[in-house]
Amino acid sequence: MSKIFEDNSLTIGHTPLVRLNRIGNGRILAKVESRNPSFSVKCRIGANMIWDAEKRGVLKPGVELVEPTSGNTGIALAYVAAARGYKLTLTMPETMSIERRKLLKALGANLVLTEGAKGMKGAIQKAEEIVASNPEKYLLLQQFSNPANPEIHEKTTGPEIWEDTDGQVDVFIAGVGTGGTLTGVSRYIKGTKGKTDLISVAVEPTDSPVIAQALAGEEIKPGPHKIQGIGAGFIPANLDLKLVDKVIGITNEEAISTARRLMEEEGILAGISSGAAVAAALKLQEDESFTNKNIVVILPSSGERYLSTALFADLFTEKELQQ
């Protein structure tokens, strides 16, 4: 029996869970989300936020979508918008990689760059200004607070992990951008499947440790960092802090060096935030109590999306680049 998808947004999910054989002790299992249709974990929320808006009747012909993004959510929304015939405007910090900008343009999105120093807060503010200029014309999807974000991970990512491990998952690690992945997967495994001893680990940049600060009851003090896709500088509404059992901070250098190791030692093209997540798993394994635990790690995107960044710096000499 043939299986034909009616549009590309319907092809999300069922990404492979791959054992890391040379990084760690063989207990780290990487969920390779670059196998999604627009090559990142954000394909899931891009599709579901648009499907949800259609179901609720707020997205209809003539309405244009608006969303702030660090890149991957924007690309995910752009491919779904193109597949389903919607116009899309994205606001994004100017510090994001040129590859992301080019992909967004190629998918037909209108791209508005915002001041890099203002981070995602600046992009969010600009998106809100655009919508306020004509509320009847524009619809803001709000990935940081839209319940359709964690919902898709609760419905797809969580069940996939549970099935692929036969329920033998002890630790779940995800970098936190919107918080949707960590929240949705944890809700499914801890709640629906009743595995309350699952250890859910949030990964954030050491230079912007806002989750650790929030859990410690400290003042939130975000900072600049180079781990694109995580560390938005605030606690997103979609991050359920009650589900977070542990927070691990990762430096820019740790994220980049581990992403390179994934490429060189495991043959997995991994982005910077993927490196951060695996670096967190390696830190966990330094604790003997985690030696025999199965650790599932989300690898959000492919390294090809970071060719112009520090991830690929120093790989070629000037002469080699000119050849």
UniProtKB/Swiss-Prot annotation:
List, alphabetically, the SUPFAM superfamilies matched.
Tryptophan synthase beta subunit-like PLP-dependent enzymes (SSF53686)
- Gene Ontology BP annotations: amino acid biosynthetic process; cysteine biosynthetic process from serine
On temperature dependence, the record says: Optimum temperature is 50 degrees Celsius.
Knockout-associated phenotype = Significant decrease in tRNA nuclease activity of contact-dependent growth inhibitor CdiA-CT from strain 536 / UPEC (deletion in strain BW25113).
Q: What induces it?
A: Repressed by sulfate or cysteine.
Result of altering residue 42 to A: Still stimulates tRNase activity of CdiA-CT in vitro and in vivo
Reaction catalysis annotation: O-acetyl-L-serine + hydrogen sulfide = L-cysteine + acetate; thioglycolate + 3-chloro-L-alanine = S-carboxymethyl-L-cysteine + chloride + H(+)
Gene Ontology terms: cellular component: cysteine synthase complex; cytoplasm; cytosol
Q: Kindly list the positions at which N6-(pyridoxal phosphate)lysine occurs in this protein.
A: 42
Q: Provide the pH dependence.
A: Optimum pH is 9-10.5.
Keyword Amino-acid biosynthesis on entry: yes
Short name of any one Pfam family annotated for the protein: PALP
EC number(s) given by UniProt: 2.5.1.47, 4.5.1.5
Residues at which pyridoxal 5'-phosphate binds? 72, 177-181, 273
Residues engaged in binding hydrogen sulfide: 8, 35, 269
Essential cofactor(s): pyridoxal 5'-phosphate
Residue ranges that the Swiss-Prot or TrEMBL entry lists as coiled coil? none
The record's keywords, sorted A to Z, are: Allosteric enzyme, Amino-acid biosynthesis, Cysteine biosynthesis, Lyase, Pyridoxal phosphate, Transferase
Task: Quote the NCBIfam families the UniProt record gives.
Answer: cysK (TIGR01139), cysKM (TIGR01136), PRK10717.1 (NF007989)
Q: What does this protein do?
A: (Microbial infection) In addition to its role in cysteine synthesis, stimulates the tRNase activity of CdiA-CT from E.coli strain 536 / UPEC; stimulation does not require O-acetylserine sulfhydrylase activity. CdiA is the toxic component of a toxin-immunity protein module, which functions as a cellular contact-dependent growth inhibition (CDI) system. CDI modules allow bacteria to communicate with and inhibit the growth of closely related neighboring bacteria in a contact-dependent fashion (experiments done in strains BW25113 and X90, both K12 derivatives).
- Self-association and partners: Homodimer. Forms a cysteine synthase complex with 1 copy of CysE. (Microbial infection) Interacts with CdiA-CT from strain 536 / UPEC, this is blocked upon preincubation with O-acetyl-L-serine. CysK forms a complex with CdiA-CT/CdiI. One CdiA toxin subunit binds to each subunit of the CysK homodimer, and one CdiI immunity protein binds to each toxin subunit; the immune complex is thus a dimer of trimers. The 4 C-terminal residues of CdiA fit into the active site of CysK.
Q: Which PANTHER family match?
A: CYSTATHIONINE BETA-SYNTHASE
Q: Which family does it belong to?
A: Belongs to the cysteine synthase/cystathionine beta-synthase family.
Name under which the protein is recorded? Cysteine synthase A
The upper taxonomy is:
Bacteria, Pseudomonadati, Pseudomonadota, Gammaproteobacteria, Enterobacterales
Instruction: Tell me the gene name.
Output: cysK
